[in-house]
Structure formats: C-alpha cells, structure tokens
C-alpha cells in the first residue's frame, strides 16, 4: 500500500445495532477524503483511477484536489470528474503556486467538509485492494483500544512506466538516520520487522 497516508480527523458515526448487514452498511457509509495537492503531475489521473478501482466502497471515497496546472500539459485534465459529487477541486495556474504547505492548507480551508476521515497523500500513489476499509478498520480498532491515532508510513516505490511490475511490496517506516550539522534530523525509510505477521499498525516515532 502507498502509505504516505495520514488519517487526521475522526468523527463517530452512531450505530447501535447487531448483524453483519448493519455493520457493512455502517462501514460503507463512512466517508474518507483523499487530500491531494498536485503540481503538474502526470501521475494524478492514474492515482485517482487506482484509488477508486481498489477501494472496497468507492462511493465513499471523496477527493480534495489542489490542481496546480498548465493548460498546455493535458495529462492532468480533470474534466471527467468535475460533475462527480465526490470531487472537490481547487484550480490554479502553476505560476500562482506557493508550495506544498500552501496547497495542503488550501485543501484544508476550502475542500475539507464533513468527511469522517482524511487520507493525506501525494498525487503519485498506488493502492492495495480494499485500502479504504483496511485503514478505517485499523484506525477504529486503535480508537477502541484507547488511542487517538495518526496512521502513517514511508511510501515504497513503484515505476509508473512498468507498473505493476517493479513495485516494492514491502511496507516501510520512517527512521532517524542522523542529525545534519545545522541541527535538523535526517529521516530515511527502513523495513518493518516481521511485517508479514502483523495484523495492525505498530507504534512509531516519526511521520512522513
């Protein structure tokens, strides 16, 4: 899974009833906003398509996109999604862009509405099957265990030209490598021991 992923907000959906069907309906009704700043990125459209194709409940996947674009590019044309209620798009000419923090703040201020969860990504990702339910289940289980979790990871690599070949299918985490001479810390990716046997996230010190 491309887990440069952060769930940063949680609202409780009240549902006090029994039965498998009720649980499934409750799960499918929980919405998740994919928080995507995109700067002239040819991988934006493939990222959107892969997210929807691999979601267990694609109707509950919403998109908040800050599109910093050049109209001459064409590869990030979102016209096919402009009438889709799941998509909220803020467009600006790439010459007006002010950097990643500005784009993320713009999404927070104008595109984040009443979704139950937020999944903060870059605009170049691939997804595993049922990624939406996996993340929500992990989050909710941690809440039930008494935590107030943020779920994240260090994104493993993929090659957009050959994908799905050459994908790195091992999840990574953020590790401290050293301090720079001027005092800031250098973060690098590292493997997660025994990840094949894990059923839930592990505690971490750093968030990518």
Residue spans for each PLM region:
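Catalytic cores of eukaryotic secretory-pathway lumenal/extracellular enzymes that build
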Residues: 29-208
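Acidic, Ala/Val/Gly-enriched low-complexity intrinsically disordered segments
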Residues: 6, 14-16, 24
